[in-house]
Regions:
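Helix-turn-helix DNA-binding elements, focusing on the entry/boundary residues of the two helices
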Residues: 34, 45, 213, 227, ...
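Alpha-helix N-cap/helix-start motif at helix boundaries, enriched for small hydrophobics
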Residues: 34, 46-51, 117, 230
Length: 261
């Protein structure tokens, strides 16, 4: 079961309902492709937002009065820069706001003494001056096979539609665009994915991270693959991050409670 603050893993029934209800709203091809990538490849929301055509397919030549053809790749290669978020390409317009900070005991004692000295000197004290530096996420490139049939169909349907609407797209153009035609920022896509999961499909406590958690949990618990395999799929630099997903999923806990003798 997800810890407080963690995205909920939808059940198979909830997942089927999600893809059914997506068809009842605008832009079903795009939204289906986004959610299939989330559930079948486990990409982070910022990685989905930063995807470009060249990561997904090889575009054919532009032809007059003809729909542009394409060929889906067999493997998607995610650059390490994608895992660092939108700032890698300057798409994020939202200033980073820190929610928590942590110190060692020695560091905390040192800061307290500094604040005491400033207070005795009647100097201005700005808490932000004492925050530790923000740790920069290193990022890690990874290759993920595009072999799932439903995923490939969703991508094909969406690409056909995009190329019908605009044949002159370039390999470096964003794969997913908003209604206004611009690229998604991670924050905007995060909100949109949460809208589909919670409001459209009614999946309680779901978020843009639910598809990723569902995939990694499935790899570890149902497929019984090693943490190393799950780590590779997730793109975690440290295996300790992947270990979090070794917690039993909600459905196993529910089954255990239901079978009490």
């Amino acid at each position: 079961m997800a810890k407080s603050g963690q995205a909920r893993v939808p059940s198979p029934t909830e997942r089927r309902h999600l893809f059914e209800v997506i068809q009842e709203h605008r832009h079903p091809e795009k939204n289906t492709a986004i959610m299939q990538i989330s559930f079948k490849l486990g990409l982070r929301v910022q990685e989905i937002a930063l995807l470009e055509f060249k990561e997904i397919c090889r575009l054919g030549r532009v032809k007059k009065c003809a729909v542009r053809d394409f060929e889906l790749h067999q493997v998607i290669t995610l650059p390490a820069s994608y895992t660092k978020g939108a700032n890698a390409l300057g798409r994020s317009k939202t200033k980073y706001e820190r929610k928590t900070v942590s110190f060692s005991v020695d560091e905390f004692d040192r800061i307290v003494r500094q604040i005491e000295n400033l207070a005795l000197a009647n100097a201005d004290i700005n808490p932000a001056n004492f925050y530790p530096d923000v740790k920069q996420h290193k990022g890690k490139s990874r290759d993920l096979p595009l072999i799932d049939a439903e995923l490939r169909k969703a991508l094909t349907d969406y690409l056909v539609l995009r190329l019908e609407q605009k044949t002159s797209v370039k390999p470096g153009d964003p794969l997913f665009v908003t209604q206004k035609g611009g690229p998604y920022s991670p924050n905007t896509l995060q909100e949109h994915m949460a809208l589909m999961l919670r409001d459209w499909a009614g999946i309680e406590k779901a978020s843009s991270h639910s598809g990723r958690r569902a995939l990694i949990t499935d790899v570890i618990h149902k497929q019984k693959k090693s943490v190393k395999v799950a780590q590779k799929i997730a793109g975690h630099v440290n295996p300790s991050t992947t270990i979090i997903y070794e917690e039993p999923p909600e459905e196993e806990i529910s089954e255990a409670l239901n079978n009490i003798s």
